[in-house]
Every structure is written in structure tokens, then in C-alpha cells.
Amino acid sequence: MKDNNAFNEMMVHLPLCTHKEASNVLIIGANNEDMKAQAAKHNKVSNIEFGDTSLLTSKNEKNIDVVILTDVKIDELLLANIERILKEDGLITFTSKAFSRDEDQLFADLKLVGTKFWIAMPFKFGHNTSIIASKRYHPTADINLQRADLLDDLNYYSAEIHNASFVFPASEHKALTGIAKR
């Protein structure tokens, strides 16, 4: 299994199995056919659009449920654009740095989104670390198990992996306390 299989599955299924009913989803940044295939597994419920950051400025206010940033670095301006279009129960997922490689960047990303979101939690899979930030739904307490368990043809993602990806070693968990909003 390639690391990008895990990336595509986790970046798509984790947020879409956390949100109660994501009808409008934007996937911003680089994507490939496998990313699109993973997203297509949610087409019965979700309208999914792919594009670059200019897609954010073309959307109406408070109209998007989920924004997934595949390789786009989040900053205050981008977050303001996302905040403008995200619904009151919306969430975002984006890549960050691993705790062991650049904890300062991980902390900075968590603090940035923590100002706008009720929940801001890092999750790990393969050699990747990403963050989910949510205005309402908790990624482990509100996982839609039926949706997660009914996804077919997966190599990495499962409901169990979904929950396990939020578990960090004790020292990292302690260091994240007060920064990550769990």
C-alpha cells in the first residue's frame, strides 16, 4: 500500500464521516484520480468540487460544510476566506507538520484554527500529520459509524483507524494539552 493511498482516504473520509451531513464540500489543492475516487464514494450525500484557493472567493457566504486542503498552507487570510463560506457547523481538514519533525509549526497551526473553531485536533496516519478543526462535530464522539463502515474498496481508512489516528504518545499528548482543542 502506498502512503498516498492512506493520505487520500484519510483526508477525504475522516472529515466526511465526522460531519453529520456534508452536502457541499470543497477539496482545495493538488489532487489525483485516487483522491477523486475516494471523494466519489460520498457523492450520494455530498456535492464535491475540486479546485485551487480561488474557488474559495467564488462561493457564497455560509454555504460550505467541509473544506479539505490537500497541500495548501493555511494562514490568516486563507482562514478568513474559509470562515466566510463555512456553515455554522462546518469543519476543515488540512496538512500540518509531525510533532517529532516540527512541533512549533504544528502548535502554530493548532493555535491559528483554534481561534475560530470549537475543536482543533491533530491526527496521524502513515508518515503524515493533519488537523481537523470543527465548529460543532467532534471527530471521535460524532463519527458516523454506519457511513464509515459502509465504505467499500478501502486500503487504509476504517472506523477504528479513524479513532486511533487521534491517539498520541503520552509525552506528545501532554505537550498538546492546552493547545489542541479536544
Where are the regions a protein language model picked out?
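SAM/dcSAM-binding transferase cores
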Residues: N128-R182
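A short, well-structured beta->alpha microelement
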Residues: S46-S58
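A short glycine-rich, Lys/Arg-flanked "PGG" loop and its adjoining helix->strand segment in the class I
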Residues: E76-L91, L110
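Class I S-adenosylmethionine
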Residues: M1-N43
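Structural motif
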Residues: L26, D65-T70, T93
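A short acidic, Gly/Pro-enriched loop at the edge of an enzyme's catalytic core
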Residues: L56-V67
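Conserved Class I S-adenosyl-L-methionine
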Residues: E103-F125, A133
